[in-house]
Amino acid sequence: MSHFTGLTEDTSMQCRASAMIFDIDFHPTRDFIAAGLVDGTVELWTTPSNDNSSTASSSASSSNTSTSSSSSSVSTTAIVAPRKVLTMKHHTKSCRAICFDQQGAGLYTGSSDQSVAAVDAGGAVVWHVSGAHKAPINVIRPGPTGTFFSGDDDGCVKVWDMRQQESVMSLDLAKDFIADITFNDNYTRAVTASGDGTISIINLRQQKLMHTTEMFEDDQLSILLMKNGTKVVTGTQSGALNIWAWGKWDDLSDRIPGHPQSVQTMIKYDEDTMLTGSSDGIIRIVGLHPNKLLGMIGEHEEDFPIEKISLSRDRNLVGSISHDDCIKFWDVRAMTDAKGRGSAGVNFADMGNGDGNGDDDDEFFGGDDDDMDESDDDGATTAASSSSSNNNNNNNNNRVMFNKGEGSYKIKRMTIKMVVVMDFLMICNYV
């Protein structure tokens, strides 16, 4: 069993919000991350990036010491730390759910005050519905252009159309809270996970419930479509990952044990690899078929539970939140390199991402104008989940450690080796 030894807590960089964070989401086209807070505030932050000017100046001086540099495995490049660029307050209670639209032109938020809202590219609230649900809203997910999905604490899921500025679908799916929602990539099907132990499959064309599984004793807390839409994976209260084969809902096709506590949040890294956040405070890498706990990315201090993780647009950073009011950023490019090379030894080059100029733009969200493909496809069961399968697969072969220095942050180039852990119990205890 492989362990990504280089992905440890000292690779993190963090920004501190003004209150405890309930939800985060990376911008789909630009280097921002949005956070919904317990006091109803929404904050927008930049993500860590290279300071190219510092890189250029340091390269000149380093050329004079090429002999010593070649014998050393460490060189430095300044990093621009995250900074808050926008604060909004349009909910009276906690902002539990937040997501950018698919194009990045706007932001959707949901609150325990039962309201939903849409924020435009300039940070202005352009649409707000009080009493959007009869219960506090627990999850919001983006849909096709101009739409989004919301789920509440009573098991109701709604679809909202910004063009009509109203709900166009409402289904009572569960007897407890809707924990998570995922989709096939042409949005003909949605699958929900609920605190009553069920998952529900929705036909979005016909706007009706197709199937609800039997109730498990475990809460279903997070959900993904994997293997090009042929597998549904849920994270549970007990820590096991439940796996269904698409269309065979009467029983599980497989199960992955190993998490000692509940799996609150999951993201798809690729069709075979998931990242999980658990209540034991650790972010893990999990392989699917073969089913393995591959390693860990890091953890928050004091064993705080991981409440949410999110993947950046270029898949270079994972953002995570816990109960410490911080967004932590974890560099995962080493994981991409290790998966691509299948090598025991990996050398990493320069980061080379982000302009790091810190410019403030009038429109913080301004995304691409291209509409997503909404073509219908009856073969929905083979489609992949959401937009992560379309992400740029560029491999920078890089490993970054963010270390706080005297007012600046530095990158250290390193060589990371994968080690084999023979004892499964050791992984369970230490990963």
Where are these regions (language model features)?
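Short coil/turn segments within WD40 beta-propeller repeats
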Residues: A19-F22, D39-L44, K93-R96, A105, ...
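Terminal intrinsically disordered, low-complexity extensions flanking WD-repeat/beta-propeller proteins
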Residues: M1-T8, S58-S69, D219, D254-R255, ...
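Structural hallmark of WD40 beta-propellers
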Residues: R30-A34, G104-Y108, S115-A117, V126-H128, ...
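Beta-strand-rich domains and repeat architectures in extracellular enzymes and scaffolds
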Residues: M13-G40
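Short loop/turn segments that connect beta-strands within beta-propeller blades
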Residues: P48-N50, D120-A124, M162-Q165, L204-Q207, ...
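Loop/turn segments within WD40 beta-propeller blades
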Residues: I24-R30, I98-A105, G110, I140-G146, ...
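Short C-terminal beta-strands that terminate individual repeats in beta-propeller domains
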Residues: T11-R16, N52-A56, T76-H90, V126-A132, ...
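WD40/WD-repeat beta-propeller blade-loop signature
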Residues: M20, T29, K84, H91-S94, ...
